[in-house]
Every structure is written in structure tokens, then in C-alpha cells.
Curated annotation (Swiss-Prot):
Active site feature: E270
GO molecular function: 3-methylbutanoyl-CoA dehydrogenase activity; ATP binding; flavin adenine dinucleotide binding
Summary of subunit composition and partner proteins: Homodimer.
Pathway info: Amino-acid degradation; L-leucine degradation; (S)-3-hydroxy-3-methylglutaryl-CoA from 3-isovaleryl-CoA: step 1/3
Organism: Arabidopsis thaliana
Similarity-based family: Belongs to the acyl-CoA dehydrogenase family.
Keyword Transit peptide attached: yes
Ranges in a coiled coil: none
Range of the transit peptide: 1-22
Name by which UniProt lists this protein: Isovaleryl-CoA dehydrogenase, mitochondrial
Distribution of this protein across tissues and organs: Expressed in leaves, stems and flowers. Not detected in roots.
Length: 409
């Protein structure tokens, strides 16, 4: 761990100022000084470099043009938290990845969603399933932020029904020809490297799907217009189009027909890391509400003195802390090699639904101001709702949990 104390490292990023917030060391639920310092450092980085752009990103539906957030996060070593040091990563575990996802989400939900798709869905898939040559070719630029990564699984008529995908990969001399479409691809418009799933055998069901590494600029590969979303605005999302797109054989991730294995073996970890996104949104809700209820007065005193307001913030706080405890606990288990599908699904089910409710309470605490776009609470609600839909809906997560419980004896 000594290398992290260099001037350019995360842990060496001085925490010169601390915002007044209940999110102190005593309530962080972290018990290791290195993890605490990591959290504080990422928090300061995100508040200094990402939070000032959050409102503009939401209004313009675009990342800022005057600053490259991808490279800034790369310089801060955030993209490769779980990647080996030999490729420029930090070689840390999923608890650290969750902490980073949480603090970036606290600053901007949309930046964090794009960050999660890049660092978790793309980079971590390559780390776990790529060959040495693939890792050498793709990881350094993805980890530095020079290139952006994405993952494409869903299709216009195949969302939760992954095996029902229609995108087809036909074997030809030296590779495959891809034809079809992918939908709702986060980072799609800007990604240089994409993990894409397609059917190599239409009669083999789940065993006929293969994962491919797609590069921007491949002949026959294009992106449709950027989608105009309710929330997570600025986190670019689009449809991918494949029209006789040739992909060389060396771009297969793992092996032909192993696509569902690649997908499912990483899905539990993807759900876990993405579950930290709602944690950051809930924290941001409290960051907005607590100063407001201290300053806003009605009937001659701060509204925070009223019992019903105190009850609301108590509910918000306990929703955050219980979700945070669950996510951190499961992350520690995963770092120790105990990956449980029902708990990975449970973390994001729990955190996502609570984040939506916490954001609604935040709006209510601000009253009329909560409904005005000048305040951040409306954006936080719109951003929170995505986590009940993306990366498997809440309904699918319940199915996963129920199925796993039924199988246990």
C-alpha cells in the first residue's frame, strides 16, 4: 500500500477542508484507517472536481466541454481500482470500488453512472475474463481515462430476457460478422472499447451467446442518436447498430459460447458496486436537507426544530446507514472470496428503493423549494429512480433472491 502515499495518489490527496455533514468518521461504517482516508480523499476530489459541474451536466445533458472528467478521474487512479498494478490499476478490492462509486455519486449521479459502466462493467470484465494480450491492449488507456469503456447486453426487445437477444454473430474466416442492435448502452456514444454480447449459435440457448470486444471505428459499427433520459442526464446513453460488422477472432472475451458465463460471473459484482450509487444519492439528499432545515424558519423558528421534520431526517438517515452497512458488509465478503448472488442482488434492491424514497422525503422537507429545479432535490430523485431499473430491475432482483433462498436447504 505504500505507493498510495505519493503526491499523485489517492491517499496523498490532502483533505484540507471538510464540509459540515453527519458523514463523519463515526458514521462512516469503515473501521480501517486506510479505507477511511481513501473515502475522505475521494470525497474531496469529487466535491472539488465533479460536484461543481453537476447542475450544468443535468441541464445540458452533457459532460462539461472545458474539463475532461474521464482523464481527471484517471489521474486520480479511480478507473482501475480492481485492476492489477501492472496495467496502471490499484489492485484493490470491491469495498474500495464501492467507496469510490458512493462518493462520486454523492457529487453527481450521472458522472457516477458513467464511471460505474466504465470501471465496473467494462474494465472489471476485461480484468476478470480477458487474455494477457487483451489486457495489455485495452486496459492501460481505459484505466488512464484516455479511452472510455461500455458494456452492451440489452436490446429493444430483450431487456430482462437476456437469452432472447437477436444480435447475431456469424462465424467467418478469421472472425465473426455481427448484425443487430443493442439498446440503452451507457457511455455508448463516447466509448472506444465496448463489451458486447451476441448469439453465435441461435439454437443453443444460453450456451450460444458469446462476448466480444468491440472497438470504436470498426467497419459496420455505429451509434444512433443519444437518448433523452428523465434522469442521469449527461451520462450518455444510446442504441448501438451492427451492420455486417467484422470482429476478429482474437476479440472474443473468454471463449465462444461462454458469453452467459462471462455475464453471470460478473453480474453479482456489478450489482454490488452499482449498489453504492444509491448510497451517494442518499448522502447527497441529507447534504441538501440538513443545512436547509437549520436555516429555513416558519412560525419564528427553524423548521428542523419541528418533530415531524426530525422524524423525516431520522428516516432518511437510518435508510442510508442500514443500506450502507449492507453494501459494505457484502463487499467485504466478496473481497474474501464469498460472493453470494442473493446478497449482491439484495444490496442494490435495498439501496435503490430506499434512495428513491429518501429523495422524495428530501423534496418534502424543502417544501415548495424542493419542487423547484434551482434546488438539487428534483435531480436527485430523477437520478435515484434509474437504479430501480438499470442493471436488472427491482423485480428481477427479487426473483434472484427468492430463487436462491428456495434452493437453499
Amino acid at each position: 500500500m505504500q505507493r498510495f502515499f505519493s503526491a499523485r495518489s489517492i491517499l496523498g490527496y490532502a483533505v484540507k477542508t471538510r464540509r459540515r455533514s453527519f458523514s463523519s468518521r463515526s458514521s462512516s461504517l469503515l473501521f480501517d484507517d486506510t479505507q477511511l482516508q481513501f473515502k475522505e480523499s475521494v470525497s474531496k476530489f469529487a466535491q472539488d472536481n465533479i460536484a461543481p459541474h453537476a447542475e450544468r451536466i443535468d441541464k445540458t445533458n452533457s459532460f462539461p466541454k472545458d474539463v475532461n472528467l474521464w482523464k481527471l478521474m484517471g489521474e486520480f487512479n479511480l478507473h482501475g481500482i480492481t485492476a492489477p498494478e501492472e496495467y496502471g490499476g490499484l489492485g484493490l478490492g470491491y469495498l474500495y470500488h464501492c467507496i469510490a462509486m458512493e462518493e462520486i455519486s454523492r457529487a453527481s449521479g450521472s458522472v457516477a453512472l458513467s464511471y460505474g459502466a466504465h470501471s465496473n462493467l467494462c474494465i472489471n470484465q476485461l480484468v476478470r475474463n480477458g487474455t494477457a494480450a487483451q489486457k495489455e491492449k485495452y486496459l492501460p488507456k481505459l484505466i488512464s481515462g484516455e479511452h472510455v469503456g461500455a458494456l452492451a447486453m440489452s436490446e429493444p426487445n430483450a431487456g430482462s430476457d437476456v437469452v432472447g437477444m437477436k444480435c447475431k454473430a456469424e462465424k467467418v474466416d478469421g472472425g465473426y460478422i455481427l448484425n443487430g442492435n443493442k439498446m440503452w448502452c451507457t457511455n455508448g456514444p463516447s466509448a472506444e472499447t465496448l463489451v458486447v454480447y451476441a448469439k453465435t449459435d441461435t439454437k443453443a440457448g444460453s450456451k450460444g451467446i458469446t462476448a466480444f470486444i468491440i472497438e470504436k471505428g470498426m467497419t459496420g459499427f455505429s451509434t444512433a442518436q443519444k437518448l433523452d433520459k428523465l434522469g442521469m442526464r449527461g451520462s450518455d446513453t444510446c442504441e448501438l447498430v451492427f451492420e455486417n460488422c467484422f470482429v476478429p477472432e482474437e476479440n472474443i472475451l473468454d471463449k465462444e459460447g461462454k458469453g452467459v458465463y462471462v455475464l453471470m460471473s460478473g453480474l453479482d459484482l456489478e450489482r454490488l458496486v452499482l449498489a453504492a450509487g444509491p448510497l451517494g444519492i442518499m448522502q447527497a439528499c441529507l447534504d441538501n436537507v440538513l443545512p436547509y432545515i437549520r436555516q429555513r424558519e416558519q412560525f419564528g423558528r427553524p423548521v428542523g426544530e419541528f418533530q415531524f421534520i426530525q422524524g423525516k431526517v431520522a428516516d432518511m438517515y437510518t435508510a442510508l446507514q442500514s443500506s450502507r452497512s449492507y453494501v459494505y458488509s457484502v463487499a467485504r465478503d466478496c473481497d474474501n472470496g464469498k460472493v453470494d448472488p442473493k446478497d449482491c442482488a439484495g444490496t442494490i434492491l435495498c439501496a435503490a428503493e430506499r434512495a428513491t424514497q429518501v429523495a422524495l422525503q428530501a423534496i418534502q422537507c424543502l417544501g415548495g423549494n424542493g419542487y423547484i429545479n434551482e434546488y438539487a432535490t428534483g435531480r436527485l430523485l430523477r437520478d435515484a429512480k434509474l437504479y430501480e431499473i438499470g442493471a436488472g430491475t427491482s423485480e428481477i432482483r427479487r426473483i434472484v433472491i427468492g430463487r436462491e433462498l428456495f434452493k437453499e436447504e
